[in-house]
Amino acid sequence: MKKIVGHLIVLSLLCLINVNPARAWDAERRQPQSYELQQKYIHSFRQNAGFIHTERNDSIALLGDSLTTVLDSIGKYDEYFELKRVVIRSHILRGESRIAVAQSDMMYSKAQAMNHKFGMAMSLSAIGEVYSHMNRLEEAGTSLEEALKQLKDPSDNQILTKILLMQLVDNLLHLKNIGKAKLYIERINEYLSEDLSPVEQALFYNYNAYYCIQAGMPDEADNYLKEAWKLEPMLPVGIIRHLLIAEAAYYESKEEFEKALD
């Protein structure tokens, strides 16, 4: 009996000794998985020029906080703020406006305390989008313009710069502010096609078309839409929806209402 008890004690001690290595191994095993998820979400945001419709996936909202906590703890602040931006967008798309407002405010406070310009730009971009979804378009425009100013050297953050320019044009066209929209359209048109992804090209054509429709130039709008549709095989469904809406607006401007409804 004593021998059995002795063996059990030894086995128990061995199990206790091996708990920490097992936990460490599990943490090491999961770290690459966390990194892959972070990169997946950020890559999707960048490649789709901020117009991500797959972000309704619960995984982003559910895992986002834990992933950003990891980035914060290891001091990867550029990645932290960019991923936080993606998480806030996912909450907006899920209809969780209160969560999006709270997180964007906290994000801005953190970036401001750190004097982290990229983080402040990302935060203001998120705040601008929250305002847009709440139909507070004037406040949205102010936040987006301030976000653009925070980029010390826009050439270092071309992807975010392009996203902000498109957000601003979209905002100004909704406000029917054609004159100001034209200024940002001109900045958009400075980019060369070879420096743009297919999604970026399509969206640039799309916003040029919208501008031309509002400026009373339907034929030019039609030309931009035709160029955008050439990229259709390379575009995700969400971007194609944007083109369909622009096309409907074009037909409406031509008073071809049956085509607009198709």
Language model: regions and residue ranges:
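Positively charged n-region of N-terminal signal peptides that target proteins for export
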Residues: 1-6
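Short helix-onset patch at the extreme N-terminus, typifying the N->h transition
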Residues: 7-8, 90
